[in-house]
Amino acid sequence: MKIITCYKCVPDEQDIAVNNADGSLDFSKADAKISQYDLNAIEAACQLKQQAAEAQVTALSVGGKALTNAKGRKDVLSRGPDELIVVIDDQFEQALPQQTASALAAAAQKAGFDLILCGDGSSDLYAQQVGLLVGEILNIPAVNGVSKIISLTADTLTVERELEDETETLSIPLPAVVAVSTDINSPQIPSMKAILGAAKKPVQVWSAADIGFNAVDAWSEQQVAAPKQRERQRIVIEGDGEEQIAAFAENLRKVI
């Protein structure tokens, strides 16, 4: 059983600064970290490894220079995966969901897999598209919002999803792509033994050419800025008579 768990390196939001002059966001001092939602996918994959005989977990990511960071690679491997594959290319530096999904699908095909796990979204964009797009590109079943994995066999994965008014149980034929929610587990903090052992695990570094990836047309990012601050008018209407109600309705109409 070959399980791939996908993750994304994102800027640490605590270190993102706002430029007061134009509201643009400054990422220059923000270190890269594993997207918080992907920690749940990594944990879920490693828990499955304990259930499936001879299962192997491969962590997979596509991106830019952030993936060259040795500390970041060690952090991923210390959380349980057996190996790491990173696809590094300048074109993935600010990749949007379609481009990311296309590259992940190509890399997964090259690596081989029975099951792909993703987080529900990334901490930076949170588009919630990549997992489903990977399934569509590979033409295999894809399910998102999974809150519990019930069982795994050689050819079927059984999961639960918490819907608005009910709990849905699904049996998914493998190979498949599953995007897990944050309800599925609480990611463990790696032990010192796991951190030291991570340095001995294999890491494969691929380029876009290695996975046969051709760039796809994508929207280019022009600017990322914080929303402009608006001064509140602080209009207080006192009383409950008809005049006050009419004034309240008139003020509502102005902002709708």
From Swiss-Prot:
Alphabetized PROSITE patterns for the sequence: ETF_BETA
One GO MF term attached to the UniProt entry: electron transfer activity
UniProt entry keywords in alphabetical sequence: Electron transport, Transport
Any single biological process term in GO: carnitine metabolic process
Annotated Pfam families: ETF (PF01012)
Disulfide bond positions: none
Pathway per the UniProt entry: Amine and polyamine metabolism; carnitine metabolism
Domain of life: Bacteria
CDD domains: ETF_beta
Cited Gene3D superfamilies: HUPs
Family membership noted in the UniProt record: Belongs to the ETF beta-subunit/FixA family.
Biological role: Required for anaerobic carnitine reduction. May bring reductant to CaiA.
Subunit structure and binding partners: Heterodimer of FixA and FixB.
Protein name: Protein FixA
Protein source organism: Escherichia coli (strain 55989 / EAEC)
Name of encoding gene: fixA
